[in-house]
């Protein structure tokens, strides 16, 4: 009986982990799309590349962060 319980426990653990669907919206699942979504401060419309700072401090990390 003990061997049957151990075997049943192992099978339930293995197959239950495989049956759980992965969430496709996670960034780790979509590395190519993560590279396309560049939201860095250089793309901020208020960023001044000459000063390497923002004209306004709202939402720009080099000056205000």
UniProtKB/Swiss-Prot annotation:
Disulfide bonds join 53-64, 54-60, 57-63. This is Conotoxin tx3c. The cysteine framework is III (CC-C-C-CC). The keyword Nucleotide-binding does not apply. The hydroxylation at Pro-62 is observed in PubMed:15924437, PubMed:19380747 and PubMed:22709442, and the non-hydroxylation is described in PubMed:22709442. It comes from the Eukaryota. Causes scratching in mice. It is found in: Secreted. GO terms for cellular component: extracellular region. GO terms for molecular function: ion channel inhibitor activity; toxin activity. Its main location: secreted. Residues 20-50 form a propeptide.
